[in-house]
């Protein structure tokens, strides 16, 4: 039969064949490279088949459709074999192929293929229907979900430190960090009626001198009829809790520069003085006070009634936290979390700049008189004598491990529990002293009155991955073998949740030591084992090429090539010059949001993440000096190139992303989940978050694709069987049924909600409040909003 070579007919066939040929060449060449470094054979085989399809299309043979149908079905079989019926994992393997298959069965396309082949069109239609059926089934049957139901049984727990039901007077509602409210006016039956009650705008936005890492992470506190909150620049606001109207504000006039690694404030602390322990001058000056940490190294006491400085505290209300520090340059020491407040003591820790040099300021923990600001004690984790008080001739220790996340406090035991970070530089540790290693990445229990060590437990030995304890620990009394045990839950970046008796630091849930990958960079070492808690969200298997992802099979192929080029032998693979895949990544499976524990039901709500990072050590050379230049400043971010002056390597730290900027690991990257704390089992786990606000173009309507997004911020839970969480990279506050994880409601936020919400009652009405100000390095929309939600008056 003669081929009709009319211009329009031939052009369409030629373009179709050209597309197939280009796809085939890409898959063949890229796939050959992948096979050469140990990856899957699928891609070069698919490339050869695609080139065969292109040749047949060029020859106008309808048999191309038969061959393409075989490729499509083979791809679906291979995809299910690699990843199961996981919709988001199957999508990049099949999306381009399905769309091209649909193109080929369009009448104006296949009719131009004038050399017939019996049943070719029907074969491709069947292949497309089978592929569509597999994807549809996968879309409604998520293999990553766990679908159980928590017991509703609840026994009222004795409060460790009583808090009025209607209040939220501390960062985690109580200083035990439970993030649980006994309020139940808003409950699982009526939360779908929740409406915006009021919005307050702080006016605090990014300034020209700010670094990229400016973040709005505050959880407000509420005492009586007033809400207290700080902004990214630590401006303090007092709002009417019912209307959201400003009562007063205080501006510490923070002066930042681009070297600050953080510009943020997670919260403030509240103290009410008692006449039996405070002087008459204190009682007259500031009986109720707000304690405000400021990123330049100040701690400020402000009258809770009127916003004026407490004149009897420290230097007319301002305490200099840089006193006796070994390096006082602004931005190197940054208190970003609210301190613990006892009847006598303010327990203050702070953040230090990560990965800058071996001559950084100290991570010392200090106790100050809550009324006067006088230094009562110090615990310098890197000093030979941690409790030694410095003088004008003797400073605190360079590069002591720091505790940057909020701490927890047991008033009955008078113990404060601090989640510790690692000695910086973080990613190479060959020169660390035994003192610097001793308490790094540990839970540290100190007597809050004296600063003396009660006990410590190390969660990562010789930490080379920045696997700090990043979250406020949570204290609760939990039933173990029929007996109530006072425990502490410490979520770690590794995904482990370490559970210890908070009286003595003994493990309640086993955490056996297990072998980990060996082979550190030159001059460094790796410990042979690490502890692995049996209560954990850490990955159940190591990553493989099959876990790589992308928008299409083409960038997925690039991710697979990158994966096989890096060093990766599972969790705790040592940093390397080759580049090491770090999973869980530097953001961790847990971050500063922590977990929420209902002490009555003995259940916990958690929101773990799963986003790999890549660390690559950079040997010293031109442009990468070992000695710190005199004018050197911080990088203003925790990612990218970090100098690590004083050790043999700089380092680059970045998320593991595709050429399109998408995570190279397949979704989910974020979950919401519930734990039964009596059995230590994950009862339910769901993906949380959509790509709506991560798209390259605005999406004015909700996107129904629940992928499971990265997040920063934590959950809260209530006696109404409802949990609330924002945190995700899309701008929503969501409510879930605590018992089974069913999403009950979501409210659109005007900016990123990378904060933990809180709830309270005033004038008989329950409110839920969230900061919606965005997160600079997370890339969410920036703003200055505080948003409150409540039920309409006619809803009960």
Curated annotation (Swiss-Prot):
Spans traversing the lipid bilayer: 11-37, 41-58, 63-81, 96-110, 119-141
UniProt xrefs under InterPro entries: PQQ_b-propeller_rpt, PQQ_mDH, PQQ_rpt_dom, Quinoprotein_ADH-like_sf, Quinoprotein_DH_CS
Record keywords: Cell inner membrane, Cell membrane, Membrane, Oxidoreductase, PQQ, Transmembrane, Transmembrane helix
Record keyword Transmembrane present: yes
Pfam families in the record: PQQ
Assembly, per entry: Monomer.
Topology in membrane: Multi-pass membrane protein
A biological process from GO: non-phosphorylated glucose catabolic process
EC number annotated for this UniProt entry: 1.1.5.2
Family label: Belongs to the bacterial PQQ dehydrogenase family.
Lineage: Bacteria, Pseudomonadati, Pseudomonadota, Gammaproteobacteria, Enterobacterales
Name this polypeptide is given: Quinoprotein glucose dehydrogenase
């Amino acid at each position: 039969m003669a081929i009709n070579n009319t211009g329009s007919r031939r052009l369409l066939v030629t373009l179709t064949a050209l597309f197939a040929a280009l796809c085939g060449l890409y898959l063949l060449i890229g796939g050959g490279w992948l096979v050469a470094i140990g990856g899957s054979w699928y891609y070069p085989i698919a490339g050869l088949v695609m080139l065969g399809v292109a040749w047949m299309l060029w020859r106008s043979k309808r048999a191309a459709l038969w061959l393409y149908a075989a490729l499509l079905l083979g791809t679906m079989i291979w995809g299910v074999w690699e990843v199961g019926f996981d919709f988001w994992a199957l999508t990049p393997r099949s999306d381009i192929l399905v769309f091209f298959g649909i193109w080929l069965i369009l009448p104006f396309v296949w009719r131009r293929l004038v050399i017939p082949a019996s049943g070719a069109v029907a074969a491709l239609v069947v292949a497309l229907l089978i592929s569509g059926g597999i994807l549809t089934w996968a879309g409604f049957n998520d293999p990553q979900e766990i679908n159980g139901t928590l017991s509703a049984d609840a026994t009222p727990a004795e409060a460790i430190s009583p808090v009025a039901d209607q209040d939220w007077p501390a960062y985690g509602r109580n200083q035990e960090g439970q993030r649980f409210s006994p309020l139940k006016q808003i409950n699982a039956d009526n939360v779908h009626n929740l409406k915006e009650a009021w919005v307050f705008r702080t006016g605090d936005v990014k300034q020209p001198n700010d670094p990229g890492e400016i973040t709005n992470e505050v959880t407000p506190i509420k005492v009586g009829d007033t809400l207290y909150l700080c902004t990214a620049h630590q401006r303090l606001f007092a709002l009417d809790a019912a209307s959201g109207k400003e009562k007063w504000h205080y501006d510490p006039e923070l002066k930042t520069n681009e070297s600050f690694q953080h510009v943020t404030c997670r919260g403030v602390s509240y103290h009410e003085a008692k006449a039996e322990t405070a002087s008459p001058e204190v009682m007259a000056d500031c009986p109720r006070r707000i304690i405000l940490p400021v990123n330049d190294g100040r701690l400020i006491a402000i009258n809770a009634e009127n916003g004026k400085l407490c004149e009897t505290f420290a230097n007319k209300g301002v305490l200099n936290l840089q006193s006796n520090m070994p390096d006082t340059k602004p931005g190197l020491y940054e208190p970003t979390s609210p301190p613990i407040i006892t009847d006598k003591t303010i327990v203050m820790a702070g953040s230090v700049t990560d990965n800058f040099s071996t001559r950084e300021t100290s991570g010392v923990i200090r106790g100050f008189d809550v009324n006067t600001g006088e230094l009562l004690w110090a615990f310098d984790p890197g000093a030979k004598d941690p409790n030694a008080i410095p003088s004008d001739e003797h400073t605190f220790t360079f590069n002591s491990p720091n505790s940057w996340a909020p701490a927890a406090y047991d008033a009955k035991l008078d113990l404060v529990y601090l989640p510790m970070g690692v000695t910086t530089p973080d990613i190479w540790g060959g020169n660390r002293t035994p003192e610097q290693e001793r308490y790094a990445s540990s839970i540290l229990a100190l007597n809050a009155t004296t600063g003396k060590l009660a006990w410590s437990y190390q969660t990562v030995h010789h930490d080379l991955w920045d696997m700090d304890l990043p979250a406020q620990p949570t204290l609760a009394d939990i039933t173990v073998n029929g007996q109530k045990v006072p425990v502490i839950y410490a979520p770690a970046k590794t995904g482990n949740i370490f559970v210890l008796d908070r009286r003595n630091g003994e493990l309640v849930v086993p955490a056996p030591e297990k072998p980990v990958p060996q082979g550190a960079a030159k001059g460094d070492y790796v410990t042979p084992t690490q502890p692995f808690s049996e209560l954990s969200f850490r990955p159940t298997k190591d990553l493989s090429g099959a876990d790589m992802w992308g928008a299409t099979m083409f960038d997925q192929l690039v991710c697979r090539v990158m994966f096989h080029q890096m060093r990766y032998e599972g969790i705790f693979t040592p940093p390397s010059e080759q580049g090491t895949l770090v999973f869980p990544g530097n953001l961790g499976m847990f971050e500063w949001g922590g977990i929420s524990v209902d002490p009555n039901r003995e259940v916990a709500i958690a929101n773990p993440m799963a986003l790999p990072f890549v660390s690559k050590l950079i040997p010293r050379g031109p442009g990468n000096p070992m000695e710190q230049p005199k004018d050197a400043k911080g990088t203003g971010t925790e990612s990218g190139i970090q100098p690590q002056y004083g050790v043999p390597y700089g380092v680059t730290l970045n998320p593991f992303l595709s050429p399109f900027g998408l995570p190279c690991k397949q979704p989910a990257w974020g979950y919401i989940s519930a734990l039964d704390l009596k059995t230590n089992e994950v009862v339910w786990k769901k993906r949380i978050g959509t790509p709506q606000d991560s798209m390259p173009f605005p999406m004015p309507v909700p996107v129904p694709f629940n992928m499971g997004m990265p997040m920063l911020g934590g959950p809260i839970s209530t006696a109404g069987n409802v949990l609330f969480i924002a945190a995700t990279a899309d701008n929503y506050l969501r409510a879930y049924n605590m018992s089974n994880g069913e999403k009950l409601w979501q409210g659109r936020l005007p900016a990123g909600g990378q904060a933990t919400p809180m709830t309270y009652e005033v004038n008989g009405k329950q409110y839920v409040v969230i900061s919606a100000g965005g997160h600079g390095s997370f890339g969410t929309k920036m703003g200055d909003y505080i948003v409150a939600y409540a039920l309409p008056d006619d809803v009960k």
